[in-house]
Amino acid sequence: MNNKVTSIKGINLPKTKLGMAKMNKLADAAEELFATVGFYNTSIVDICRKANTAVGTFYIYFETKIDVYRFLIEKYKNDIQRRLDEAISAFTNSIERRREGIRFFVKYITNSPTAHNIIWGSIAVDRDMFFDCFTSFADSYVTKLFGDDESASVMSYSMMGISNLLGLKAIFEKMSDEDIDKMIDEVLFSKLV
């Protein structure tokens, strides 16, 4: 779970590998519980029980339950942005970069449904957290995928919407990589975009 989460209010990042391992164990347990029973049906005691960790240990790293949720959101944001950068780095053509960006995200959703569910679930947990998450993605995509285009912000949000819904379609239909590529090309080269 070490995806360069550096500083978040309510989170005390450990300075040792052992401390980081304990914090990640708690975060992993919370992630599983949030994904299966939901944020509101999960208690700190449940998280600690699942992590086989004392409740006091939780409070060394997190002030509240919502702080571990924030930690997970930051982890996902960092992971998605780092991996998106890697996915599009070989492409210079803007259409190819956008295609690869959509492809990356659709594959991310199909391979990491828990992350996707927790990110979208944040709208019910803390609307500001949800807003900040998607604003961060949009701002990042503006520069990476659209450059100086004056409509870059609108296009960035449009791409996020398209990527999310295509990802859900890929999950629902259990699409192969080949089918995902075909679907993305149909969208990119249709009159829609």
How would you label these PLM feature ranges?
Residues 78-81, 100, 124-157:
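Amphipathic alpha-helical packing segments from all-alpha helical-bundle domains
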Residues 71, 85-111, 181:
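Hydrophobic alpha-helical connector segments
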Residues 1-21:
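N-terminal intrinsically disordered/low-complexity leader segments
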Residues 116-121, 128, 145-191:
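Hydrophobic/aromatic-rich alpha-helical bundle segments in the mid-to-C-terminal region
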Residues 25, 29, 33-67, 71:
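Helix-turn-helix
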Residues 29, 33, 104, 108, ...:
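Amphipathic alpha-helical interface segments
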Residues 20-32, 78, 83-85, 130-132:
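A short, Lys/Arg-enriched amphipathic alpha-helix from helix-turn-helix/homeodomain DNA-binding modules
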Residues 62, 69-79, 83, 119, ...:
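Alpha-helical DNA-contacting segments of helix-turn-helix folds
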